């Protein structure tokens, strides 16, 4: 008889439930496990070569019922009833449509009520569920970990492997507990928490880990907030981020199109309730954040870890002890055209972008509307508000949010990845500075020569009104 099973973390439980064939060997010499994949999400940018590989090998999609595609990265956010102007974008979208038709994959194209950013669509349809393994050819697949799933981005060759076999060979990841306790101050959001965490541990601090977010602040957070935090786990270098499912999770999923019903719902919840880290389980490492000490955050550099509280100033590289950090800061400040010691609140912006798979959900749009109500976007500032999906847009319209945005002088767009990345018409001009609710501030991310600062939706809205980096409290 075997001994009692050792206590396990949430990630280990989900992983163990999906091992088809265990890797051979021990410790460092152990081979990868073959992991079953419950849900495969597909979009137009990373899938064409994968479908070509299937075609050349004479294979088919093994589980089209577990594969869902949507158009998001390249799609325009205006005039969606007209042909896509950019030839490369048009070819990629048309190719996805042909591939999905040929291989029997469900697709939500532009204009479809269920179309939107892939990481918004999955949860809103109830496709994303606790205990699942979820993959997509996109870094921010970690978003779905907010439901207690192991969710990760994969490359094109791995996409082909999943399409053909519904499995992936993977080595187990290390585990990191990120505990956020304390009382979250007014005006501080999930986006501020994750930006503060990345600033604390660095963009490589989570490399090789699955991060499990825990603590009273996470437990009291909405699903939208949890998705924001898990979404940016990859920006700390992590493979995935997770939150244990609870009543908040169940209520979000209840009655969604693909959620279980009746006795199947009861059985699913009974299983989901087991998806918690055992009391005696040991993480490979642990990190703590005191929420009470947090404040609105803004990045100043060219990676998500180069951030400071809004009340702070641009840091001085000369005061940095680490040579690598100092050189990176000097390079970033040169690109961003910023001087050390400049108060963040004194930095003017040319554009404000609200949207993306990080902050394009209805809760985010409500926050923005609350700030914009009764105000106008500052002269010389261009503000784009892009819902994460057609469903989000419809709900925002029903709640009167679109009217608030337009009255304030913002552009209220159709769904898509939009200005998060320069793969569609929504781009910055060289030298333009943008406050963005997206997830990456790399050089040229929003367009060649564009300068991106990552902020929360609330800070984005206040910044649009004042024209310089601001919090809602600054408008009073």
From Swiss-Prot:
The gene is leuC. Keywords: 4Fe-4S, Amino-acid biosynthesis, Branched-chain amino acid biosynthesis, Iron, Iron-sulfur, Leucine biosynthesis, Lyase, Metal-binding. The keyword Chloroplast does not apply. Its EC number is 4.2.1.33. GO terms for biological process: L-leucine biosynthetic process. Catalyzes the isomerization between 2-isopropylmalate and 3-isopropylmalate, via the formation of 2-isopropylmaleate. Heterodimer of LeuC and LeuD. Binds 1 [4Fe-4S] cluster per subunit. This is 3-isopropylmalate dehydratase large subunit. It comes from the Bacteria. It catalyses: (2R,3S)-3-isopropylmalate = (2S)-2-isopropylmalate. Its cofactor is [4Fe-4S] cluster.
